[in-house]
Amino acid sequence: EQAARVLALDHWMARGVALNAPGPLWRAEGEASGLPPPHLSAQDIVWIEGYLQEPSGFNSAGEPVALNFATGELDTRQLRHPDGVILDIGTHVLAMLRETLHASGGDTALSLSLRVAKDRLGHDIAPGDTSTAEGEAHLQGTLGTIPLNIWLNKYAGPAGGQKGMRIGLRDGRIITFDRAPEGEVVTLQDGERVQRWTRPGAIYTHCLDEQILGADNLFIRAPDSVAGLTQRRLEEVEWLLRLQQQLRGPH
């Protein structure tokens, strides 16, 4: 049975909405005490980066191995294309970046190229290889006229775990959005001065509340935006599939 409407979501979208719709859940810390998180305008943005650096362990041979999300134990699965970082986690990062820019009044037209694609052991993915999963990738392009870089790594080692974005502002300040031990954190860096805000709770929960199930969900507050939001998610998948075809050849 065909649905009358389709809504394409990604839980990371909630991070973009959060920056320009701060609610009472945001808590200022230290120097930021009493101040709301920074309001973002697309006119102020000169560059934007997204990153997902997943923690990993090592097998008995000293090779990097992914970790199971639920248990933190070594993931014994043998990942194969298309389960590499480009399609697996590139979708999350793109959704976060584009929804942030959209909420800031910016142009979300996407242009993207693949700069680096390596396997789990750090070897380049060879043209024509339609089986090896990418463990690391660097994507580069533009959102509208804003330079864009995306850094993806499933094997970032024990120090991994960074998931978020950095936004360079015209006045030299940098906004960073990352995860915190029990939620999310926004920092505003101005030289050596750093202001910080945190929001407890999982991104999944925030997205469900803000976009689907909450009293002020997307269908209530902005029903006319559903089609555009879905179109952006489809465009992102199309771009990533296109990069895979360019990297590996038609398949």
Place the predicted regions along the sequence by residue.
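Predominantly a Rossmann-like dinucleotide-binding segment in NAD(P)-dependent oxidoreductases
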Residues: 2-105
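A structural signal for well-ordered alpha-helical scaffolds and beta->alpha junctions
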Residues: 14, 29, 90-97, 160, ...
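Short, solvent-exposed loop/turn segments at secondary-structure junctions
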Residues: 14-15, 53-56, 117-119, 155-157, ...
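Short, surface-exposed alpha-helical recognition segments that flank or form part
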Residues: 43, 81-88, 199, 203, ...
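Generic structural motif
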Residues: 48, 106-119, 173-177, 185-186
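Rossmann-like dinucleotide-binding domain that binds NAD(P)(H)
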Residues: 58, 68-159, 235-238
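NAD(P)-dinucleotide binding in Rossmann-like oxidoreductases
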Residues: 126-213
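C-terminal helix-rich "cap/oligomerization" subdomain common to oxidoreductases
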Residues: 211-251
